[in-house]
Amino acid sequence: MKKKIFTFLLFLFLSSCGYEAIYSLKNRANYAFQISKLELSGDRQVNLKMKQILSTYSNPNIAIEKRKIFELKISSDSEKITTTKNASGDATKFKNEITLKVQVSMDRTIISNFSVTEKFIYNNNSNTSELRSYENQIKNNLTEAAVDKVTSKLALIK
């Protein structure tokens, strides 16, 4: 009986916790901007992920007088740094760092320049294929976090 009550209460609390996906269409409507031109340079993997995410942020359904139309130039840099080594000189920890340098233009006039950096420290793995796969996953996650910060800053531009 206690198990059923606990399960019911758990379901009740979790179903009404107010969770909303960050990238839902409802939340994207709050971003009153459209990206008319996107120039990317730097790390290819980061640029592909950025292009995939930023292409969804053009919102033509917003009234034209309220919509800001931006042109973006983004330079990306990805760096893998060895942070810790063991006694024999082998790397035990790495730091993956992604930096985005963003130039925002509106009507061919530069209105903002800013930089976004995301970092993650992780342990080495003896299996190189697993390590490479994990590093790619980390790079994608860091890119998503950095692009989220970029879109938040774009939404705040008046």
Predicted regions and their residues:
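Surface-exposed short loop/turn segments
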Residues: 52, 56, 61-66, 71-115, ...
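Solvent-exposed, flexible loop/coil residues
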Residues: 26-29, 37, 115, 125-126
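Bacterial Sec signal peptide processing site at the extreme N-terminus
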Residues: 11-34
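N-terminal hydrophobic targeting signals that begin at the initiator methionine
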Residues: 1-2, 18
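Compositionally biased, intrinsically disordered linkers/stalks adjacent to structured regions
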Residues: 26, 135-158
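Sec-dependent signal peptide recognition
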Residues: 2-10
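Short extracytoplasmic
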Residues: 41-55
